Amino acid sequence: MSTAETPQQPQQQQKLRWGIAWIYSSSNNTIITITDLTGAETVARVSGGMVVRADKDKPSPWAAMQAAYKAAQLALARGINAVHIKVRGPGGYGMKVPGPGASAAIRALARSGLVIGRIEDVTPIPHDTIRPPSGRKGRRV
């Protein structure tokens, strides 16, 4: 008896084109920028204020989710189908943690069909003290 083996054909895998999704999330707005790997060319830039009507809705997680969906669609149309995510908060004098829209934007990017690589927090944190804007002796009223 002869056993005829069928040659297995390799599955065609889609070539991944990587980009970087920069998510800046503060207590006032969420801005999502998708660039190429070098960061030189901006592929898509959408903010929470571009997808909502009222200013009070800009920092909401819903606005961040809609902005992330829109940015992902623009990136997929330009050929980028995989991203590394870099999340940033205000830092410096502001909050050292990202705002309320950061996690919602990450979830939306994952659900939109983009392949997620690394997720990194790049909030600028001072390692010494920073002088307050009011100066050395404080604000005199």
From Swiss-Prot:
Pfam families: Ribosomal_S11. Keywords: Ribonucleoprotein, Ribosomal protein, RNA-binding, rRNA-binding. GO terms for biological process: translation. InterPro entries: Ribosomal_uS11, Ribosomal_uS11_archaeal, Ribosomal_uS11_CS, Ribosomal_uS11_sf. One of its GO terms (molecular function) is structural constituent of ribosome. One of its GO terms (cellular component) is ribosome. The keyword Chaperone does not apply. Belongs to the universal ribosomal protein uS11 family. Located on the platform of the 30S subunit. PANTHER family: 40S RIBOSOMAL PROTEIN S14/30S RIBOSOMAL PROTEIN S11 (PTHR11759). Part of the 30S ribosomal subunit. This is Small ribosomal subunit protein uS11.
